[in-house]
Amino acid sequence: MLATADMSDGYTNGARLKISTSSKPKFHFIAGLASGLSSAILLQPADLLKTRIQQAHQTSALLFTIRKILASPQPIRGLWRGTLPSALRTGFGSALYFSSLNALRQCIANQGALVPLHGDRDDKRTRTSALPKLSHTANLLTGAMARTAAGFIMMPVTVIKVRYESDYYAYRSIWGAGRDIVRSEGFRGLFSGFGATAIRDAPYAGLYVVFYEQSKKNLNALNFGGLTTARPLSDEPAREDNSEKQLVTSSISVNFVSGALAAGLATSITNPFDVVKTRLQLMPNKYRNMAHAVRLVLREDGVRSLFGGLGLRMGRKAISSALAWTVYEELILKAEKRWPDQDNIEQLTP
């Protein structure tokens, strides 16, 4: 995606630079993979506890669940049960998501739909984000589309992960869980709960990007992190090492806090869909479809059950999203600085 801006303040001949805010697709895939793996491994215990709590009739059993796991012969292993499918799902899911998100945003921007959020025009000499600046509507749509596509591809891993984490099933291995699902439910079983997952993830991802970009705008306006100036682009290195360190620290702080705030807001709005999705994936024979699951959950467990695991999910999402997006953005910016794409900068004459 190319965004052309006047750069006469740095060029006496009045020439303009056409600067691409895009980067190589492999950068986004690798950065997404690294960010997803790190957050999945570190926060697996919280994800496991959330799955256990959202099981039927256990919406207030957090302490009981923790005590039960800690009293087992291998408590540490029990807390990290299901780490492999979770890491595969989150790692490759994040890689696919960030790659798709970047491609969609470039496509929209190339069609002339680039609408900066940070004022009428961004300072093209500097930027803190690996993402282009789009309108709120474009942020919402691209986030939702990218998450839905990645979620569909990774759905079989998600189903296996949820079944393996739950204590409803006595699976001894991940591969055994997959074989049992296919044998008893067919390949369709590997996509149990996709409707609820898509309805949860699409608005979550869309709202997240909107809240994330808006939070960064507000924090920068408040001089959060002690510095309002963004870091230089790779073709304009910092003149002083101290300034560069301040720029890096400031952008990391803004990205991390923005990620946590955005995740908290988006999670609280979409948690009922997460509960329904978990029930569908755990008990497909009991719940025929999403609408049927909602009716049964409300009748048997009440409205409160739709917010089961909200505290855990909100805490986990806030930390994991903040970590994942901060790592992703930093890796992209460092990759662009170390391996600049010469095709991204084109000298133009007026």
From Swiss-Prot:
Localization: Mitochondrion inner membrane
Disulfide bonds: none
Reaction(s) the record says it catalyses: glycine(in) = glycine(out)
Transmembrane residue ranges: 29-54, 82-108, 140-165, 193-216, 254-280, 309-327
Pfam families the UniProt entry points to: Mito_carr (PF00153)
Main localization category: mitochondrion
This protein's GO CC annotations: mitochondrial inner membrane
Keyword Mitochondrion annotated: yes
Keyword Repeat tagged: yes
Membrane topology: Multi-pass membrane protein
GO molecular function: glycine transmembrane transporter activity
Keyword annotations of the record: Membrane, Mitochondrion, Mitochondrion inner membrane, Repeat, Transmembrane, Transmembrane helix, Transport
GO terms, biological process: glycine import into mitochondrion
Solcar repeats: 23-107, 134-218, 250-334
Family note: Belongs to the mitochondrial carrier (TC 2.A.29) family. SLC25A38 subfamily.
Protein purpose: Mitochondrial glycine transporter that imports glycine into the mitochondrial matrix. Plays an important role in providing glycine for the first enzymatic step in heme biosynthesis, the condensation of glycine with succinyl-CoA to produce 5-aminolevulinate (ALA) in the mitochondrial matrix.
UniProt-recorded name of the protein: Mitochondrial glycine transporter
Taxonomic classification: Eukaryota, Fungi, Dikarya, Ascomycota, Pezizomycotina
